[in-house]
Regions:
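Short, solvent-exposed loop/turn and secondary-structure capping segments
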Residues: 76-86, 118-121, 137, 159-162, ...
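Conserved alpha/beta-hydrolase
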Residues: 95-114, 344
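Alpha/beta-hydrolase active-site loop
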Residues: 116-137, 336-342
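Accessory cap/linker subdomain of secreted extracellular hydrolases
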Residues: 20-55, 173-255, 331-334, 355-359, ...
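Primarily recognizes the serine-hydrolase "nucleophile elbow" in alpha/beta-hydrolase
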Residues: 144-196
Length: 367
């Protein structure tokens, strides 16, 4: 009888393991905890699809889970020469992943690999629920709190989650996030596409910073003229986008259901105007903070993800080397990101309101 009971228990464990959507998993020890890395089966457009993921648990877990939503479309990450250095489930490691683990949070992220917008939110929501279940299956309790941290396109997903998923996520940290304000984005892109051919340094070298066309372009992007070295990346992209049909996209509701903190650089000509517009119309205002870090571009200069931008700028877009250099030479918003995450956690878990929205110097403490 005892042998029969043991056999039943083993069989039950095997059935549970077989039912886990986390397949091809490799478990290892990492600094500060343990890591599970492999493929997870998710349902996208009515069918199962396997996506790369990472799930880390700290040696001393604080009971909360942080979900990372990477930028871009997903897939491979490159160094400046074009060599593949990783895939996007680990893209936010140096931004928030390792930091969260060191603070006692479980951390998980999935490579959406081409899935964005509402479908990207659906994928991220599925993944989050599966992670919560998997943690319980592995002997941990269900996370008490779940936070979403998104960068760029992943920030757009975090924004949608903050507006639409109050039962799953307790707080959102958005870094240089997309999806701020559609009307402002369309205005920015239209003006940039019209103005860029008039100041493109490849055709108009040496235009002084005080020239009216330069200041008009600065106003269109929402960035100072000092950010001029970085403009060719988005300027050329805006011209290319203007030749394509405008796709259908809905505007963000700007109605937050959970505490939300945003961090962005003041030289971020991809999203800064939209985020300022979003901050102006967001409701309720006491659920939102916007921290702008002076002189920082869309990607922090010390984020290894900037190398993919450098590779695209030089090798694919054929922009001048100076543009790629400028991307990597800028200051960092990572200290503000991590400080913001701490404020978000305190806001959610103790009710302590974070500092008011403000503009800060790199490495300066929020006040």
């Amino acid at each position: 009888m005892k042998r029969l009971l043991v056999a039943v228990v083993v069989l039950a464990m095997e059935v549970v393991a077989a039912q886990s959507p986390f397949v091809s998993a490799v478990e290892s020890v990492v600094h500060g905890g343990r890591q599970l890395k492999g493929l997870v089966t998710l349902d996208i457009t009515g069918g199962p699809v396997e996506k790369r993921y990472v799930l880390r648990t700290p040696a001393k877990w604080n009971g909360s889970l942080a979900i990372g939503a990477h930028g871009g479309s997903g897939g491979n990450n490159f160094d400046r020469s074009g060599k593949i250095i990783g895939t996007d489930e680990t893209a936010l490691d140096d931004v928030i992943g390792r930091h969260a683990l060191s603070k006692g949070f479980a951390y998980a992220s999935v490579d959406r690999d081409g899935t964005g917008g509402p479908a990207g939110l659906s994928l991220t929501t599925q993944f989050t629920n599966l992670v919560r279940t998997e943690m319980t299956r592995r002997g941990l309790s269900t996370p008490r709190r779940t936070y979403i941290v998104g960068l760029s396109a992943g920030g757009g997903i975090a924004r949608m989650a903050a507006e639409e998923s109050p039962t799953l996520f307790d707080g959102a940290l958005i870094i240089a996030g997309a999806g701020g304000d559609l009307v402002t984005r369309l205005d920015r892109q239209t003006r940039m596409a019209a103005l860029w051919p008039l100041i493109d340094p490849r055709a108009h070298y040496g235009i002084p910073a005080t020239d009216q066309k330069i200041t008009a372009y600065a106003e269109a992007t929402g960035t100072p003229v000092g950010a001029r070295r970085l403009w060719p990346y988005t300027g050329a992209s805006a011209v290319a986008a203007a030749s394509r049909p405008i796709g259908q996209a809905g505007n963000s509701s700007a109605k937050l259901t959970i505490p939300t903190i945003e961090v962005v650089g003041t030289w971020d000509d991809l999203v800064i105007r939209e985020l300022r517009a979003y901050s102006a119309r967001v409701e309720p205002k006491d659920r939102h903070r916007l921290y702008q870090v002076e002189g920082v571009w869309h990607m922090s200069g010390d984020d290894d993800g900037v190398m993919s931008f450098q590779y695209i700028a030089e090798s694919r877009m054929k922009l001048d080397q100076d543009v790629a250099d400028a991307m990597g030479e800028g200051p960092s918003y990572l200290p503000t990101v991590r400080e913001g995450f701490g404020h978000l956690v305190a806001w959610v878990e103790t009710g302590k309101a974070p500092p008011a929205s403000q503009t800060v110097r790199p490495n300066a403490t929020l006040r």
